[in-house]
């Protein structure tokens, strides 16, 4: 991985948006090709929907595994990608992507992390876990007191 100089974007071969099972498996596939990756996810830990919403749920559609728990799947993927040493950017949301004339991408996260990326893989699944707010005028005045949102 190329370390960025202060204020300069991180030069990355690939930025993967989403650290759920698909994003983790993408690290593995890229690693087999000798391509390093940066993973960006809004959650504070890898695993996406599997670990955030249903870690104990049995999964039946993984090739060569008749049944596998959601957390077990994530643990196996984490072990599988360990040799490829991805760079993690957890608790960050991609807020800006722009394709440049030279074919590379400028990517910026909610934490201000900036990338100069050769490619972007969108493995965001259902997207970031953010509540769908009530669309009524004035409802925001009651948020946190009488209107509460939670995703989990």
Cite the ranges covered by each PLM segment:
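Beta1-alpha1 glycine-rich phosphate/pyrophosphate-binding loop at the start
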Residues: 6-87
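FAD-binding core/adjacent interface of flavoenzyme oxidoreductases
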Residues: 1-17, 32-33, 88-152
